[in-house]
Amino acid sequence: EVTVTLNGHNYSATTDAAGNWTLTVPVSDLAALGQANYTVSASATSAAGNTASSQANLLVDSGLPGVTINTVAGDDIINAAEAGAGQTISGQVTGAAAGDTVTVTLGGNTYTTTVQSNLSWSVTVPTADLQALGNGDLTITASVTNANGNTGSGSRDITIDANLPGLRVDTVAGDDIVNSIEHGQALVITGGSSGLNAGAVLTVTINSVAYSTTVQADGSWSVGIPAANVSAWPAGPLTVEVAGQSSAGNPVSVSHPFTVDLTAVAISINTVASDDVINAAEKGTDLTLSGSTSGIESGQTVTVTFGGKTYTASVAANGSWSVNVPAADLATLPDGAANVQASVSSASGNSASATHAYSVDASAPTLTINTIASDDILNAAEAGSPLTISGTSTAETGQTVTVTLNGATYSGNVQADGSWSVSVPPSALGALTTSNYTVSATVNDKAGNPGSASHNLAVDTTAPVLTINTVA
């Protein structure tokens, strides 16, 4: 057994045949850790009594970095001259370091930069990108991930008021990602315009297929993409291209990138309680449910349904996941067969689920010992022949019954009819003196639940004395 100590709490784990071990620290214990450096110590003692130990340092950094975005164009309103000159978007970060990457998104376009030594950052949005956005309200978002994997973000609302004719494409499929479910459905692409006449014809091109639509009185437009065409889109980056003419007859166009994510995702559930059977002892301690995923990003949420309750876990960097089921929840589980379900979705919305069967067997098997030697008394004649000790049990066929008499043990197996028996040889019976003995028997069912019984046996191997008085 391995004992692990973290923040004053001890946890136990058992090594497998290869010498590996693992354990789960409850969420409640992790939540109690402050942001600091901790020492994790582990020790183990072999069967021979030899002890080994090891330590590792653990940094807890659960604080999210912050990102701020400075005022854009002096007043968060980009006019015609400012749009024509391009704009620099800048800001500051906290909880991050120089060299960390800042990702900025504006109107479907993404720009990246690195944090400077004074924790500032900046990106340049070119004139062409600004003019393609057209007039209207927009939101700038910026995010940064620090060295410990914590991600923070910030946003800022701006307005483009440049009196520019232009077109805009709204977010595609809600997040600019078409997942495997959406890939099989019809899709509506929408957008807006300024400086175009109502009724102006627009050509929308996706994956080399052109669709025609018209501008509405409020400047909006939309086009429906049939499911057959959507399902023909290949995985990877695609672009919505929209082209038309302004009210002055000048050509206007816009491009909007999106992604088709058809990554196959999967989730699995490992064996429950090492053998898919929860016995009485296991029912009295916390249980770890675990499994693995593929095609799922680190940090995505796994939802587990077990015993009528729902638990959540996060996907680790290696695709694994685990949840802790408290003993209090296990205590309410009835005996019988059941299933555990787990489901997860990727960041793009592709989902997977799995079901795993297990059973609960927390009932101890019954065990009885029949009358021994027909009257529970072993006489001298019976002690000279093998003695059969027998009984019944509700343990499964083939389970081993261990019988102890006078310090010696004998083994038998449960038969199909529930009976069992062992034979005690005369050599062992001969060692019994005239006295009272206790015969004990034990058995474990396949789930590991123990059953036991005992029976009294009297040994009387002393021959009676017979005398004949003097005759006449």
Please describe what each predicted stretch is.
Residues E1, I89-V93, I189-S193, L289-T293, ...:
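Aromatic/hydrophobic beta-strand junction motif of beta-rich domains
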